[in-house]
Amino acid sequence: MASEHTAKAFDSDLQELTRLVAEMGGLAERMIVESVDALIRRDVALGQRVVAADAEIDNLQRVIEERAVLTIARRQPMAVDLREIVGAMRVATDLERIGDLAKNMGKRVAALESDFQPLKLIRGLEHMTDLVQSQVKSVLDAYAAHDLPAAMTVWKGDEEVDAICTSLFRELLTYMMEDPRNISFCIHLMFCAKNIERIGDHATNIAETVFYMIEGQQMLDKRPKGDMTTFATTAPGN
């Protein structure tokens, strides 16, 4: 009976970790969409709400790490059970970083001054955001369902995000060269595009965590990359 009780308690601990990761993931998905929406609509209030939401993401990461460490100390899990707990901590770390990147985009809304807003660039950013948000949702679903093929689909899709980012950078550079008055807006958009691309990288990280949880080893394959840009993703102090 004691061992049965211990097993049920451990299952309950794992279920709670999964629930917390799902809650954190839902918040991260919302922050991605709202940060770009705020930027496109110049909605400072929405941008500020995204910034404020980052504190909730940070708190959820702390709770997940504390519960994970406590579960390891109490249950002393091995093999697949231990990988479940380590996986939850790794996913939480990536989601916290996604929150930071979305927060940085939310902060930039207030800095936009120009009315310059070419439709082609905006549509490109929206397309890239939709793709990355879909990848984040898909990989979190794969994590919850232990669906390795679905996780690997996200992993392979990272190259498409990189290619869109590179194309958008080229368009932005063209607009800046054509008219110096466009430079400020285009630079902010560059930061945001690079942040979205980095969010895609974190979705790829989560896919690799799913592989680790299921297969019991790290992925050795080289990531498919199509990004030809080099750009800082956050401003100093963020």
Each language-model region and where it sits:
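Cytosolic, long alpha-helical scaffolding segments
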Residues: 1-238
